[in-house]
């Protein structure tokens, strides 16, 4: 088989009380040949289910401003942009901004 996509969900240590309710998406990737088929959204939904099953209430993630498709996927899945870092990456001599998102996945935070 060939890997079509992946999502890496990171859970904080339970000893970190201040963020013990929040999981983060570290990597979310869909191969170019597999895009446009809903896989990115299905991976997100699976990650949210896993986080809920482990009693997490929120998921956070970050994305480069140049990743337009990913931004559309996150926003259509209910993620809210809460911040921008003007210099998130430097590629060559170009400064690229980064966006920060969150989604509450339980009623506990509403």
Predicted features along the sequence, with ranges:
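Conserved phosphate-binding and hydrolysis motifs of nucleotide-dependent enzymes
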Residues: 1, 5, 38-40, 78
């Amino acid at each position: 088989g060939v890997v079509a996509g992946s999502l890496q969900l990171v859970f904080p240590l339970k000893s970190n009380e201040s963020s013990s309710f929040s999981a983060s998406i570290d990597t979310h990737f869909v191969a170019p040949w597999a895009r446009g088929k809903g896989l990115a959204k299905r991976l997100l939904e699976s990650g949210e289910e896993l986080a809920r099953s482990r009693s997490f209430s929120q998921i956070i993630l970050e994305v480069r401003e140049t990743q337009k498709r990913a931004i559309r996927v996150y926003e259509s899945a209910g993620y809210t942009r809460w911040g921008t870092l003007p210099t998130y990456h430097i590629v060559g001599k170009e400064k690229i901004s980064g966006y920060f998102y969150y989604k509450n996945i339980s009623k506990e935070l509403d």
